[in-house]
Amino acid sequence: MSAPAVPTDVAARVARLLRDDLRGQTAYGAPQLEVPVRLNTNENSYAVPPDVVAAITAAVAGSASDLNRYPDREFTALREDLAAWLTEQTGVAVEAAQVWAGNGSNEVLQHVVQAFAGPGRVALGFTPAYSMHPIISRTMGSTWVDGHRGGPDGPFDLTEGDVVAQVLAAAPHVVFL
């Protein structure tokens, strides 16, 4: 019996190491179009005001000596400030420990799926919706169930009864609304 052929192409070698459930998946991508308003990438159509640019520049300059270190991974100061702001805005006491911060929505969604869904568990969502919901769910090993929309008010309608029925049928561990 001869030894298996060793692929010379690095991409082929890496592909062989990939989890079976991820083979054939395509990476998330949002086209970068040259248009006045980019709704697909959550960009602001307006330029950053000069005073904001100056404030950011000053803050970066003041922090430059610490750029060789990772920032506070617990986002302590940010969470304390957000808790104080929420308390002030709502009149409800919010502690920093009750505030969750992350490096963008995708990281927070990934944390939710890692904690509550994952391998052998189910995530349910109703498309059209945020395209990362099924991608994050699948890459974390969850089974994705694409819920159905459509009702008396149109093809994108989603009623409480529809949601409850589909949640009961799919028994998901995470529901994206």
Regions found by a protein language model. Give the residues of each.
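Conserved core of the PLP fold type I
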Residues: 65-177
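N-terminal small-domain helix-loop-helix segment of the aminotransferase-like
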Residues: 4-104, 111
